[in-house]
Design a protein with these regions (language model features):
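Positively charged, amphipathic and often flexible ligand-engagement surfaces
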Residues: 1-338
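Alpha-helical bundle segments enriched in helix-capping/polar residues
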Residues: 337, 341-345
Length: 351
């Protein structure tokens, strides 16, 4: 409540990992129903927008995978539609969290089906999370914009840098894929984030996408504010931060820029917190992380405020040469066994 009185809003994340059984999925479904009902009954506090709920699709179906596409687009769709309809009735926004790259196309297909559902027409409060470390991030944003224009829909869109980087790298190596689905340099991800932010604040998305920029990097936040001023879209977007992080940074943003800021807050039992906490530590505790470098006395301030494009230009290639491509993982001893990602439509079409 004190944070909301200061101007913050919230997005509540019900803790829990991917459902392995139908019982798991039903438990998470009940948790989401309760969360929506609880938030919906709370009176509005402070000047910020009403709190929202973040939904993890893999928690709502034990077979959330491309091989089970038909089941996903019927059974999982029905679950999410029920939650979204319930949320609409109680004026609680819904945001669908991003997960691994393998599930991206399937999640977009399901999201499109939700936007086309008669029960959700004209709502404008069912959002999506997109990851800037993905090489497909900008094309996804363009596709979503065209979809929104076709349907006359407005969608909240949370832009994050991504929390599954280690998983994506290791999976691509284990499967012997041709390349990685994510940028292998942090500077590449930071540059992608700013390129996507520029697009989201441009006239192309106006009236279609409501941008939500999630970051704890002070340079990124400053760049977004500058891009918004340049695009003449002041305050027609919001920032987001994790609970317990970025307090001083975003207190300043609210005070000096009167900008909406939403706190992403985990909710659940202690036993469910560990996987979430590990992802946050991997994301923000890496040596290259802004948050990590900020408290390192050996890192000069100049390097913290250096533009990521400037940093990226110092390298000979966009790819990190210290992370060999999956086929060359065991070079020079031998070539890695080759695999094919059947969850990506482009790979399937090439067969």
């Amino acid at each position: 409540r004190p944070q909301r009185e200061k101007g913050y809003s919230y997005s509540f994340d019900m803790l829990g990992e991917a459902a392995l059984t139908q019982d798991d999925a039903e438990k998470y479904m009940a948790d989401y129903r309760l969360a929506i009902d609880t938030v919906g009954k709370e009176p509005q506090v402070g000047p910020g927008p009403r709190p929202s709920i973040s939904i993890k699709l893999s928690a709502l179906h034990p077979r959330y995978e491309v091989a089970q596409r038909e089941r996903v687009l019927t059974e999982l769709f029905a679950n999410v539609l029920e939650l979204a309809s319930r949320a609409r009735a109680l004026d609680v926004g819904i945001s669908i969290d991003a997960e691994e790259a393998d599930r991206l196309e399937l999640s977009l297909e399901l999201y499109e089906k939700l936007l086309r559902a008669p029960a959700l027409q004209g709502w404008g409060e069912i959002g999506l999370v997109v990851q800037a470390y993905s090489k497909r991030c900008l094309p996804v944003l363009v596709w979503l914009t065209l979809l929104g224009k076709e349907l006359g829909a407005k969608m909240p869109l949370r832009l994050v840098k991504g929390a599954y980087w280690d998983t994506e790298i290791k999976y691509a190596q284990q499967q012997g894929l041709d390349n990685y689905p994510v940028f292998t340099r942090k500077e590449g991800t930071d540059t992608s984030y700013l390129a996507c932010a520029r697009y989201l604040l441009s006239e192309h998305t106006r009236g279609v996408i409501y941008p939500q920029f999630a970051s704890h990097n002070a340079h990124t936040v400053s760049c977004v504010l500058a891009l918004a001023a340049e695009a003449k879209t002041p305050r027609d977007f919001e920032f987001q931060r994790l609970h317990g992080m970025g307090d001083a940074l975003y207190d300043t943003v609210i005070e000096q820029h009167q900008q909406t800021v939403r706190i992403y807050a985990p909710v659940g039992a202690h036993k469910d917190l560990l996987p979430y906490l590990v992802r946050r530590l991997l994301e923000n505790g890496a040596n290259s992380s802004f948050v990590h470098q900020l408290v390192d006395p050996g890192v000069p301030v100049e390097s913290l405020i250096d533009h990521p494009v400037t940093q990226l230009r110092k390298f000979a290639s966009l790819a990190n040469d210290k992370i060999p491509l999956p086929p060359a993982l065991f070079s020079p001893a031998r070539k890695n066994s080759q695999g094919l990602n059947m969850n990506i439509s482009a790979a399937m079409q090439a067969l």
